[in-house]
């Protein structure tokens, strides 16, 4: 029934009329029209930006004429790319099956690099409620995805872990037999591999990502010594760079990026006679001057402070930044607080979702996800067996939480990260 039509044309027509989630914007391409490319200035910027990469990519395929650099039949490469970067990343797996050029564009990560340059990002939530198992959730399509299982290593399986998403990678940090190890999940290959180790391997650190880089600060080494060192991770070449040391040693701290600077907040430091000491200060790292500045009382207050609980029993500060505003979850008081950067004080703005149960803050995820805050957790009661994902778009009003998803699961979140690409 397809005689006389180019092979790729059949595939494209079939793909573009396939049922997909509600955010997909492929349908206009069947007729070749550019219905939503109305911003001429934006398109001109994109064409200038992509011109630098066109020459090297056009000659990479030497197969049939339909595969030799053509992305979408009937459209030039620049217009095809303008359309492709606006599509949901949930569709890229299907799109990659159309022809070799599309597959190369997606599997190489080039399409995600162009999306970053254009500021076209989607924010997916990755979390683990079972040891060595990870799931992803797309807030736009409300779709759940199960990742391949992590490498089976009993020591790593039961060790404390930290996680961080940067670029199209999810990094999971842990302990394996006699040394620290980092496993890397690649969105491009949908597989796990061992990542390059830090210059000073550690655990219990504070971290955050910003575009194509991430900063890790503090933590403790394999002998348990609390560190004041920090490192910068470059996603593009997967390298680690040692940064200047902080003013204070700290572990079990949290990290965020705000106003283009990295902040490490709270944690446990070293007091007199090397005794553990709860830190209420934070530190700001300016990537331009490469200097740390201490900020007093930056760690959010907790409702159960002063009740005799060991500092090590409490989770690191649950913090998130949306639109350069810092928010925190007070798990004991079930409250949400906003940080006033000028007055350097925390103000309560509302409450956490009802089902945001935790064990001294452990098992509850509080993350920035684009222009919203995501809370993942379940009821405190044992045996309930479900978790909820609730979201709130911060504003001047009291938080109004919206249920994004709910599923049967262990109601304890071990690790959580948001991948923006």
UniProtKB/Swiss-Prot annotation:
GO CC annotation: nucleus; peroxisome
Pfam assignment, any one: Kelch_1
Highest taxon above the source species: Eukaryota
Residue ranges of the region described as Disordered: 54-73
Annotated keywords: Kelch repeat, Repeat
Protein name per the record: F-box/kelch-repeat protein At1g26930
Gene3D superfamilies (UniProt xref): Kelch-type beta propeller
Entry keyword annotation includes Metal-binding: no
Kelch repeats: 114-167, 169-212, 213-260, 261-312, 320-366
InterPro entries recorded: F-box/Kelch-repeat, Kelch-typ_b-propeller, Kelch_1
UniProt domain F-box: residue ranges: 70-117
């Amino acid at each position: 029934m397809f005689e006389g039509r180019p092979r790729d044309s059949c595939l494209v027509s079939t793909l573009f009329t396939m049922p997909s989630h509600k955010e997909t914007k492929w349908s206009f391409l069947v007729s070749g029209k550019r219905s939503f490319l109305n911003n001429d200035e934006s398109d001109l910027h994109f064409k200038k930006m992509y011109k630098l990469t066109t020459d090297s990519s056009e000659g990479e395929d030497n197969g049939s004429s339909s595969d030799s650099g053509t992305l979408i039949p009937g459209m030039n490469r620049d217009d095809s790319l303008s359309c492709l970067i606006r599509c949901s990343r949930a569709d890229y797996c299907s799109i990659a099956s159309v022809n070799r050029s599309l597959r190369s564009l997606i599997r190489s990560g080039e399409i995600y690099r162009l999306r970053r340059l254009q500021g076209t990002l989607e924010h997916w939530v990755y979390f683990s409620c079972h040891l060595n198992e990870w799931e992803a959730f797309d807030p736009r399509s409300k779709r759940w995805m199960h990742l391949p299982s992590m490498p089976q290593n009993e020591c790593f399986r039961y060790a404390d872990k930290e996680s961080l998403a940067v670029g199209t990678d999810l990094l999971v940090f842990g302990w394996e037999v006699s040394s620290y190890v980092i496993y890397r999940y690649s969105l491009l290959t949908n597989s796990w591999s061992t990542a390059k180790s830090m210059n000073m391997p550690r655990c219990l650190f504070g971290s955050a990502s910003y575009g194509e880089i991430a900063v890790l600060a503090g933590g403790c080494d394999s002998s348990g010594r609390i560190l004041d060192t920090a490192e910068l991770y470059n996603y593009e070449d997967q390298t680690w760079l040692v940064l200047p040391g902080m003013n204070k040693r700290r572990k079990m701290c949290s990290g965020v990026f705000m106003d283009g600077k990295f902040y490490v907040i709270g944690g446990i430091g070293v007091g007199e006679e090397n005794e553990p000491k709860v830190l209420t200060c934070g530190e700001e790292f300016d990537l331009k001057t490469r200097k740390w500045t201490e900020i007093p009382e930056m760690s959010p207050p907790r409702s159960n402070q002063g009740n005799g609980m060991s500092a090590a029993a409490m989770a690191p500060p649950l913090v998130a930044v949306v639109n350069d505003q810092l928010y925190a979850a007070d798990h004991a008081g079930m409250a949400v607080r906003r940080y006033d950067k000028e007055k350097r004080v925390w103000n309560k703005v509302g409450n956490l979702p009802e089902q945001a149960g935790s064990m001294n803050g452990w098992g509850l995820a509080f993350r920035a996800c684009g222009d919203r805050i995501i809370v993942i957790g379940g009821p405190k009661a044992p045996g309930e067996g479900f978790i909820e994902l609730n979201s709130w778009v911060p504003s001047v009003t009291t938080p109004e939480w919206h249920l994004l998803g709910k599923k049967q699961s262990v109601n304890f979140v071990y690790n959580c990260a948001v991948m923006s690409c």
